[in-house]
Regions:
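Short, exposed beta-strand-loop hairpins at the edges of beta-sheets
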Residues: 104-106, 110-126
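Boundary at the C-terminal end of the N-terminal hydrophobic targeting segment
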Residues: 20-24
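Short, solvent-exposed loop/hinge segments that bridge or flank secondary-structure elements
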Residues: 25-26, 31-65, 69
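Hydrophobic helical h-region of N-terminal Sec-dependent signal peptides
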Residues: 8-12
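Contiguous, well-ordered beta-strand patches that form the walls/edges
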Residues: 57-109
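Short, solvent-exposed mixed-charge patches
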Residues: 130-132
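Bacterial N-terminal signal peptides that target proteins for export
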Residues: 1-7
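N-terminal signal peptide c-region/cleavage motif recognized by signal peptidases
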Residues: 15-17
C-alpha cells in the first residue's frame, strides 16, 4: 500500500487565480515555517537539505520541474489549472521503484499552499515557502 508522500505535494505550487509558471513553484517548502533553518541550506545559490532534515518537519525543494524530498525525487509531468485548484501529475522515484502520483494543489496566499491526495487515503497537508 502506497502512503501519501509530501514530496509530491510541493509540485503543486501556484499563485491563486494565476496561470501556473515553473518559477511560481521554485523554492524550499515545509509544513513548519519555524523549522526552515533546521531543514534547508543554501550554498552557491543552490538549495539543499541539511543532514538531519528528516528529523524535523521535513519538506520539499522545487527547482523547475524537479521536486526533491528527503527520500524521494519527482519530475512534474503535467500541471492542469482547474480554477481554484491545480492538478499535478509527477513521476516519482524512491530509489527502488518509480510511480506516477497525482495531487491537487490549492493556494492560500503567495507563500502558502495545501496539497491533497484522494488515494489511497484522503490527505491534506499545508505547506509554507521558506525565505531562502
Amino acid at each position: 500500500m502506497r502512503i501519501f508522500n509530501p514530496l509530491v505535494t510541493l509540485a503543486l505550487l501556484v499563485t491563486q487565480s494565476a496561470p501556473v509558471q515553473a518559477a511560481d513553484l521554485n523554492g524550499a517548502w515545509t509544513i513548519d515555517a519555524s523549522a526552515c533553518g533546521q531543514i534547508f541550506t543554501k550554498e552557491n545559490n543552490r538549495l539543499s537539505f541539511k543532514k538531519d532534515a528528516d528529523l524535523h518537519a521535513g519538506g520539499l525543494i522545487v527547482q523547475g520541474k524537479q521536486i526533491t524530498g528527503t527520500f524521494e525525487k519527482c519530475t512534474v509531468k503535467s500541471l492542469h489549472d482547474d480554477g481554484a485548484t491545480m492538478r499535478l501529475i509527477a513521476s516519482c522515484s524512491d530509489g527502488v521503484s518509480i510511480s506516477d502520483v497525482a495531487f491537487d494543489l490549492t493556494f492560500s496566499g503567495e507563500n502558502n499552499i495545501t496539497l491533497s491526495s484522494k488515494a489511497p487515503v484522503p490527505v491534506q497537508m499545508p505547506y509554507v515557502r521558506c525565505p531562502m
